[in-house]
């Protein structure tokens, strides 16, 4: 069974096992009577068997998601606005401009062209001043990337820093500062104090009268840590101000929470490390433009009582199976399913293969040979934004999740 169909089977069976009228809408009409019969015959055995089957189905789904166990998100888990916006842009929802929080957000076409998974990491709260630098102008901090699976190949990574406008002093409009990003090559304990061994990863000269996010390429460091299995000693940020006094050093690049700032605001402004990787399954993320679906016109669809093979509506709601606590978006999706007859002779619009035509022809003279079956002939992917078992936010592309076309095969 292909991964997409297996996913749908897991979702449907879980909802059948959970029972209740609220789940009936997800079961095709042709299957409701059969479900009722199964539930009736099961009797007292239903509870124990259902629990065991549900556990097995959930394990299958988690394995497909690349998760070792079911995520149990903590109440303190934060979904970065950047990841929400990236999901909206990637899934074709950019028309809803009022929902895009990052005004200066640009879709990372190049990084996503070789990735089907995007992960985000906040830095550890503890910061270390780097000795030998001017007051509060350089810090060393750490991102824990141990949750990245072994089979995921990282292709690129970026560090996002939020900087605020500073309007102090008469010459602030002419002020510039340079932001340098370094990889720490040796831990501080192994080097002479004041002489931290680093290598420059990226640098930028920016005007300090603008409030915005800045993105830096830290791919060389992350590739060393993940591909080459080199020790991760963290990153260092250095802010060098031009045309400004020392009293303003480090004030407008946000790498730590200010005292008057609430936890909610700081959670969205913290430095964010974003990795782009591929687990070897499926295609890379591709930006989709939302378009109104216009179902292909088929003459038989105009007749309500037509029973020929076609696509039917099937909405999968993650809240019905209790997965909405760790699946951030979408809340559900239209999966569709294929159902209907494959009559002889097969019409062109039934999207049949030569084999299906021959099989249907033989069936017309020999009923022991089954008819061709109504099955999906075209499937598409969906993107999912979720929290993994380590409370890390993941955006991933899953193939073969939506039926786009049906046919007799």
UniProtKB/Swiss-Prot annotation:
Key words, A-Z: Chondrogenesis, Cleavage on pair of basic residues, Cytokine, Developmental protein, Differentiation, Disulfide bond, Extracellular matrix, Glycoprotein, Growth factor, Osteogenesis, Phosphoprotein, Secreted, Signal
Span of the signal peptide: 1-19
GO cellular component, one term: extracellular space
Disulfide bonds, paired cysteine numbers: 309-374, 338-406, 342-408
Positions bearing carbohydrate: 144, 209, 351, 366
Protein family: Belongs to the TGF-beta family.
Protein name per Swiss-Prot or TrEMBL: Bone morphogenetic protein 4
């Amino acid at each position: 069974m292909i991964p997409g169909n297996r996913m749908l089977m897991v979702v449907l069976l879980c909802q059948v096992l959970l029972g209740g009228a609220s789940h009936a809408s997800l079961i095709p009409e042709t299957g409701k009577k059969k479900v009722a019969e199964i539930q009736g015959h099961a009797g007292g055995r239903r509870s124990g068997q259902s629990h065991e089957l549900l556990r097995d189905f959930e394990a299958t789904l988690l394995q497909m998601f690349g998760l070792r166990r079911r995520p149990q998100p903590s109440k303190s888990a934060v979904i970065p606005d950047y990841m929400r916006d990236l999901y909206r842009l990637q899934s074709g929802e950019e028309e809803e401009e009022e929902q895009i929080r990052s005004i200066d957000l640009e879709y990372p076409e190049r990084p996503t062209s070789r990735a089907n998974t995007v992960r985000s990491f906040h830095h550890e709260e503890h910061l270390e001043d780097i000795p030998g630098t001017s007051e509060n102008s350089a810090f060393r901090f750490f991102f824990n990337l141990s949750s990245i699976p072994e089979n995921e190949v990282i292709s690129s990574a970026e560090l996002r820093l939020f900087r605020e406008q500073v309007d102090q002093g008469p010459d602030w409009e002419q002020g510039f500062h340079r932001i340098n990003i370094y990889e720490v090559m040796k831990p501080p304990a192994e080097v002479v104090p004041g002489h931290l061994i680093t290598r420059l990863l990226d640098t930028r000269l920016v005007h300090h009268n603008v409030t915005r996010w800045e993105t830096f390429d830290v791919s060389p460091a992350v590739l060393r840590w993940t591909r080459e299995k080199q020790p991760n000693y963290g990153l260092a940020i250095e802010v060098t101000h031009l045309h400004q006094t020392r009293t303003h050093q480090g004030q407008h690049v946000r790498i730590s929470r200010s005292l008057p700032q609430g936890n909610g605001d700081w959670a969205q402004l913290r430095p964010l490390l974003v990795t782009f990787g591929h687990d070897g399954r499926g295609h890379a993320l591709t930006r989709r433009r939302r378009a109104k679906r216009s179902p292909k016109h088929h003459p038989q669809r105009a007749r309500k009582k037509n029973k020929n093979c076609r696509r039917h509506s099937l909405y999968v709601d993650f809240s019905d199976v209790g997965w909405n606590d760790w699946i951030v978006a979408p809340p559900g999706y239209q999966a569709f399913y294929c159902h209907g007859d494959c009559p002889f002779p097969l019409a062109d619009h039934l999207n049949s293969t030569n084999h299906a035509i021959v099989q249907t022809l033989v069936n017309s003279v020999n009923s022991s040979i089954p008819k061709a079956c109504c099955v999906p002939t075209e499937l598409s992917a969906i993107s999912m934004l979720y929290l993994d078992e380590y409370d890390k936010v993941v955006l991933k592309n899953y193939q073969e999740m939506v039926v786009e076309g049906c046919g007799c095969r």
